[in-house]
Amino acid sequence: MEEEALALLKRVGLSGKENAYPRQLSGGQKQRAAIVRALCMHPEIMLFDEVTAALDPEMVREVLEVILQLAENKRTMLIVTHEMQFARAVADRIILLDDGRIQEDTDPEEFFGSPKTELAKRFLKSFEYTRSPKPYDYVI
């Protein structure tokens, strides 16, 4: 188990931090450490609820890169996010909720290209896309 944890810490860029206290880590490092703790449990599905909401922009990238790696490794995830470019790049499905009810459930290209509901159209308009990002264009 310890070998696996050390390998995962290395994979998310936290080598040498295995003995650090939470107060010694940045927000992004804390999020990545939490992801490593979850991965050590070998879950069938990982749930992320606004995992980047309280982070500074430079920390957001760190966390999204880890989630991108998980997506590339075909990890099953349910991600609640307002990071629309990222969602478009990594999602197999997009589900738009309003007051706890599903308003749209479709693939990313259809959701971003031809939203069905007025709610989705207004939601996407609020992001003012200037171009269509390519898969993984958001995270370098």
State the predicted function of each range.
Residues 81-82:
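H-loop/switch region of ABC-family ATPase nucleotide-binding domains
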Residues 20-23, 41, 73:
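Conserved signature/switch motifs of ABC ATPase nucleotide-binding domains
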Residues 46-49:
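Catalytic Walker B motif of ABC-type/P-loop ATPase nucleotide-binding domains
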Residues 61-73:
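Helical segment within the ABC ATPase nucleotide-binding domain
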Residues 109-140:
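C-terminal boundary and immediately downstream tail of ABC-type ATPase nucleotide-binding domains
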Residues 87-89:
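A short, surface-exposed alpha-helical micro-motif characterized by mixed small hydrophobic
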